[in-house]
Every structure is written in structure tokens, then in C-alpha cells.
Regions:
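Non-catalytic pre-domain segments flanking phosphatase-related domains
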Residues: 1-54, 205-206
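Asp-based phosphoryl-transfer active-site loop
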Residues: 48-65, 156, 189
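Short coil/turn segments at beta-strand junctions that form active-site/ligand-binding loops
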Residues: 48-50, 93, 141-142
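Short secondary-structure boundary segments
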Residues: 56, 100-101, 122, 166-169
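Short, basic/glycine-rich phosphate-binding loops at helix/coil junctions
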Residues: 60-67, 107-113
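Basic, amphipathic juxtamembrane/active-site segments
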Residues: 64-87
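Mg2+-dependent phosphoryl-transfer enzymes with acidic/Ser/Thr/Gly-rich catalytic loops
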Residues: 71-78, 112, 117-119, 126-206
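Substrate-recognition element of Asp-dependent hydrolases with the DxDx(T/V) motif
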Residues: 85-109, 156
Length: 206
């Protein structure tokens, strides 16, 4: 007979808004369906997260760039993403940005939220990611990474939780543990931060 630890009931799983349906499992039927097993494994991974690494374009922004007549490149960001970044930092999570872009406005916005690990103009992200691990003292098994395009794949393959916005390229979506229901620049950053913080009991109460 299966042990009690192998029995997962609906009430045992935290309500963190994950896009999955968990059926009620009576205590005398210790059987997990594939979707339930996958969900439990994801919860286990999310519980291990101590730090986050994000791409910028297509994650914090919507991948669109406005070009002024003077040639200035303008991007927009979601205010709610920024609010939860602040909460996550206050809760003790480390947050790092690794981006191929070089926007000073983007840097000012994100460092203004309290992010100190900001790396821009990066063509190969894996070496920078590994340098961040060394400087932070974190392990790849403690990192959630969110990216949306091909350059993010080497890092996505290294972390415990690989995540992406809903409008990511197919190659990224195929390998990610978690695909946010929200697109880049529209709350996907808040989505993954909120899920981890709620699952770990670090979401602020008001």
C-alpha cells in the first residue's frame, strides 16, 4: 500500500493560481494522475527558488519599440510588475537582469526598483549567469529564469524553474516548466513572482 506521503488531495495544494485542475483524490485511493504529478513536481521546484533572473525585452516589455523622429527608442513596462519586484526584494529574494539591450531608460527603471545585478548588452547569457551565481552564492538549483527568445535557452536549460511569457517563441515554450498565461510587458513578471512568494508564504498581507 502506498504511504500517506504519496497521497495528494486537493486541499493539500496551495491556491496560487496555477493553470491546472487538480481533482479530488479520496484518502483511500492514493493514485496520482499525470497532470497532478506534474503539478506537484512544479510546486516542489517553486519551493526551492531563492532567486530570479529575467530577460527584459519581451518579458518586462511587450517586444514593441517606439521610434521617435530623433531616433530615440522607447519601451513601456507594467507598473504591477514593478510593484512585486519591490516586494520580492524586500522578502529577501535576489533578482538579476541579463539583457541583450542597452537602454538607459530601462536600466534606470529597473535599478530604481532596487535591482543591483543588472547586465546589459549581453550576447551570450550563460557566462554572465554563471558569474552571477558565483557572486551571489546561489545555485542554479535555486534559480527561476524567465525569458522569451532563443538567446535565453542556454540559461533556461540550467535552472530549476524555467519560465516564459505566453507569447514566447515556440522553441522556448517547448522547454519551459511554466508558461505564464500573460504576455511580455503585461504582468508575466508579477505572475511568476507572485506564485513563488505565495507558495513559500512570503506574499505580503494587507
Amino acid at each position: 500500500m502506498a504511504s500517506e506521503q504519496q497521497i495528494v488531495r486537493k486541499d493539500d495544494l496551495p491556491e496560487v493560481g496555477l493553470d491546472a485542475v487538480v481533482s479530488y483524490i479520496p484518502s483511500d485511493i492514493p493514485v496520482l494522475q499525470p497532470v497532478e504529478i506534474e503539478l506537484v513536481h512544479l510546486f516542489d521546484k517553486l519551493r526551492a527558488v531563492k532567486g530570479f533572473v529575467f530577460d527584459v525585452d519581451g518579458v518586462f516589455t511587450n517586444n514593441n519599440i517606439l521610434i521617435t523622429e530623433a531616433g530615440e527608442l522607447l519601451r513601456t513596462m507594467n507598473v504591477r510588475d514593478g510593484q512585486v519586484v519591490k516586494w520580492a526584494l524586500q522578502a529577501g529574494y535576489q533578482i538579476c537582469i541579463i539583457t541583450g539591450g542597452r537602454s538607459e531608460g530601462t536600466k534606470k527603471r529597473l535599478t530604481g526598483l532596487g535591482i543591483t545585478e543588472y547586465y546589459s548588452g549581453v550576447s551570450e547569457k550563460l557566462p554572465v549567469f554563471q558569474a552571477f551565481l558565483e557572486s551571489s552564492g546561489l545555485l542554479s538549483s535555486e534559480i527561476c529564469y524567465m525569458g522569451d527568445d532563443i538567446p535565453d535557452i542556454p540559461v533556461l536549460r540550467k535552472v530549476i524553474v524555467s519560465s516564459c511569457p505566453s507569447d514566447s517563441v515556440p522553441e522556448v515554450m517547448e522547454i519551459c516548466d511554466y508558461i505564464s498565461p500573460l504576455p511580455g510587458g503585461a504582468g508575466c513578471v508579477r505572475d511568476i513572482l507572485e506564485k513563488v512568494m505565495k507558495l513559500q508564504g512570503k506574499w505580503p498581507e494587507y
